[in-house]
Amino acid sequence: MSPTSTATSLTDRFSAAKRASIALAIASNAEKDAALRGIAEGVLAAADSILAANAVDLATGRENGLSTGLLDRLTLTPARLQGLADAVLEIVALTDPVGQTVRGSALPNGVKITQIRVPFGVVGAIYEARPNVTIDIAALALKSGNAAVLRGGSAAIATNGVLVGVIQEALAAAGLPADAVQTIDDFGREGANGLMQARGFVDVLIPRGSAGLIQIVVTQSAVPVIETGAGVVHIVLDESAREDWAVDIVRNAKAQRPSACNAVETVLVLRAAAERLLSPVLGALTEAGVTIHADEIALPHSPGAIAVTAEDYATEHMSLDVSVRVVDDLDAAIEHIRTHSTQHTEAIVTNDLANAERFLNEVDSAVVMVNASTRFTDGGEFGFGAEVGISTQKLHARGPMGLPELTSTKWIVRGAGQVRS
């Protein structure tokens, strides 16, 4: 199963996506949901083909030296395919944002003004070794009335090709244009560069991947970008933190899925808490298979730890590695976060209300937490379904981006002959 688009050039594909976006913008919720159900069913029906293609990508990735974290993100299993299908069906159950009223009023002269949600048009996405993103973005774009042009990278080219074929067949079966979702992976780097310069065809571009990839897209794209930042995520442990909470939260945030962007990368322990918390927390991490990159104070508390480097503090490991630093006080912890954070997610474990409120007020990230695992930064966990990414910028959207964040707005003005005096 392969993509069904017959467009032979990048411009042809962008033009086809633009035309398809016009049809999607006025498609009914029933039509869009029918396509989504078809995608969910198609993913499961084509499981053998998808997994075979994924095996090819994984073998190539190992030959090319992909990191453990990227290989994990690249890997699909029957359970993960079922999870993808289930996630698409969850999107079916969500409220269609298109046409929703944001606000409205009636002027004294009787003119009625309403602001409503409308699709962006064509959403572009550039991402690395994440075939799940192919389904997530396509499904979210479809539900919100957008076409999608996907550049999933060479590492997942075989897998993404089969997945987009499944999506296009579901679109056609639902009476919607198959060109509404396209991959340009076959164009290689030319495709990525073309997508970044496709202003006039593509309305918004969303990069997902490493800090390097995101920075390239942000600096080189002529298309407006919604930045989904890398996750150099921090957890602070203060002197009042409960030991069991500190152990459970840090272990979950690092070891549950270390390749996730919301996994913790640096643990900051206040000096007053170091003697009490370092050994149990680092011991739990070691038992979970985590390599500790410790500063000179933390090193003696973790046999087998290695010395942390300055580069570690700015690294999204995407693996079972974590940096640990002992800092003088909450001031120093917040300053460290300001210096090294990618403004994704930060958390503090504390029983001190003043410290909690200060942390919430002074840390400027998309998601700031008290006494909870950073793994909760996720659209599904937040209760609004799948997300297209975690936005770390301040314009348009910030944090997990669900369906409403894939829309813009327009103003509807209804009059009865009024003119401006």
From Swiss-Prot:
SUPFAM superfamilies given in the database record: ALDH-like
GO BP: L-proline biosynthetic process
Intrachain S-S bonds: none
Keywords: Amino-acid biosynthesis, Cytoplasm, NADP, Oxidoreductase, Proline biosynthesis
Pathway note: Amino-acid biosynthesis; L-proline biosynthesis; L-glutamate 5-semialdehyde from L-glutamate: step 2/2
InterPro entries: Ald_DH/histidinol_DH, Ald_DH_C, Ald_DH_N, Aldehyde_DH_dom, G-glutamylP_reductase_CS, Glu-5-SA_DH, GPR_dom
Summary of the function given for this chain in its UniProt record: Catalyzes the NADPH-dependent reduction of L-glutamate 5-phosphate into L-glutamate 5-semialdehyde and phosphate. The product spontaneously undergoes cyclization to form 1-pyrroline-5-carboxylate.
Database matches in HAMAP family: ProA
NCBIfam families on file: PRK00197.1, proA
Name of the featured protein: Gamma-glutamyl phosphate reductase
UniProt organism field: Leifsonia xyli subsp. xyli (strain CTCB07)
High-level lineage: Bacteria, Bacillati, Actinomycetota, Actinomycetes, Micrococcales
